[in-house]
Amino acid sequence: MGFWKFPPFLVLSILVLYQAGMFHAAPFRSVFDGRFDPATLDEEESRLLLAAMVNDYEQMRARESEKAQKTEGSRIQKRACNTATCMTHRLAGWLSRSGSMVRSNLLPTKMGFKIFNGPRRNSWF
């Protein structure tokens, strides 16, 4: 039964490939058929073209400088941390990073209630 479905598919695929080959044989042409030759421009057109190129260049440089200022401003803002909240967060981060070192180096390993004068048990009761 599947054999009867195969030939129409084969014919359809050959037709599609043939049409694709026809479109490929005649490619679309661009707006400019030849290369751009600046020698064919008169003086006014060349001045207008130069002004447009300079304007585009200035706009590109302005966008780049604005982008650089935005990223530079955010870096400066992150480095300058003078508010109380920011300093508290920095101190908390520093303490959490150094806490494991303090615990391992300065505190005794066997800490119990007797070290800090905890409740004593009398043996005579």
Swiss-Prot record:
Main location: secreted
Classification lineage: Eukaryota, Metazoa, Chordata, Craniata, Vertebrata
Annotated gene: CRSP1
Cellular component annotations (GO), alphabetically ordered: extracellular space
Prosegment location in residue numbers: 26-77
Annotated source species: Bos taurus (Bovine)
Keyword Secreted: yes
A GO molecular function held by the record: calcitonin receptor binding
Disulfide bonds: C81-C86
Name of the molecule in the record: Calcitonin receptor-stimulating peptide 1
Domain of life: Eukaryota
Subcellular location as annotated: Secreted
Pfam families listed in its UniProt record: Calc_CGRP_IAPP
Signal sequence extent: 1-25
Keywords carried by this UniProt record: Cleavage on pair of basic residues, Disulfide bond, Receptor, Secreted, Signal
Family per similarity comment: Belongs to the calcitonin family.
Summary of the function given for this chain in its UniProt record: Stimulates cAMP production in porcine kidney cell line LLC-PK1 via the calcitonin receptor (CT) but not via the CT-like (CL) receptor.
PROSITE patterns: CALCITONIN
GO BP annotations listed: adenylate cyclase-activating G protein-coupled receptor signaling pathway; regulation of cytosolic calcium ion concentration
